[in-house]
Regions:
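Conserved catalytic cores of very large enzyme subunits
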Residues: 1-156, 177, 184-209
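Contiguous, well-ordered alpha-helical segments that form the cores/surfaces of helical PPI scaffolds
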Residues: 160-173, 196
Length: 209
């Protein structure tokens, strides 16, 4: 965060610098960009992150923020595998589109299956009111809860996550160059293009489902 640890003259920049050196060897800790435009209008005490996968802030079904919400189901796309199996860039996007569609279908299937499970499967979550609207479900018996879709009232506030691994390796395959700082810097736009391609699809599904 600017004025905290972002710039070299910030009070805690030394801690941020140390953290990045640790990340270079151990992949931890997890970072949160407090100046992210996606969360600028949300109470900073209600924003949360889950590892490297999900920023929990926006909510199309209820209250914004991370409180009483979580990742309901997740899936990861292996970008290098798709790139390695592609003959050219157009073929890559065609395969990526297919994999994204399959990922979406799998997540929806997981979500629907969870919502149909008997309420006893989520007793600890419900008794402690960990999820939004979970107090509604625990007041009813299993049959009533299932018939009234009470689990869905809780889980619909969660997130379905499509993650990915290996963006740098993916680009390396596509441009047929070894990974290096120069290769990464000269192909930043291709990297952004791939991310925009996936983001466009997930934004569409958020509105549709």
């Amino acid at each position: 965060k600017k004025s905290i640890n972002f710039d070299s003259d910030d009070k805690n920049y030394d801690l941020f610098s140390l953290a990045t050196r640790v990340t270079g060897k151990r992949m931890n800790p997890t970072y949160f960009n407090c100046d992210n435009v996606l969360v600028k209008d949300i109470d900073e005490k209600k924003v949360g992150i889950m590892g490297c996968r999900t920023l929990v802030a926006k909510n199309v079904n209820g209250k914004e923020g991370a409180l009483k919400r979580g990742n309901i189901a997740s899936i990861s796309i292996n970008l290098p595998k798709i790139a390695r199996e592609s003959t050219n860039l157009n073929n890559f996007y065609k395969k990526l589109n297919e994999i994204c569609e399959e990922s979406k279908d799998i997540l929806i299937q997981k979500y629907e299956a969870l919502c149909k499970l008997e309420i006893d499967n989520f007793k600890y979550i419900l008794e402690n009111n960990f999820y939004e609207n979970s107090e509604i479900s625990i007041e009813k018996n299993s049959e009533e809860a299932i018939n009234n879709n009470d689990m869905e009232k809780s889980f619909k506030n969660g997130t379905l996550s499509i993650g990915f691994i290996g963006l740098a390796e993916c680009v390396s395959y596509l441009v047929k160059k070894e990974i290096s700082l120069d290769m990464i810097e000269s192909n930043l736009e291709l990297s952004r293009e791939i991310l925009r391609f996936m983001r466009k699809m997930t934004d569409k599904w958020t509105k549709k489902y």
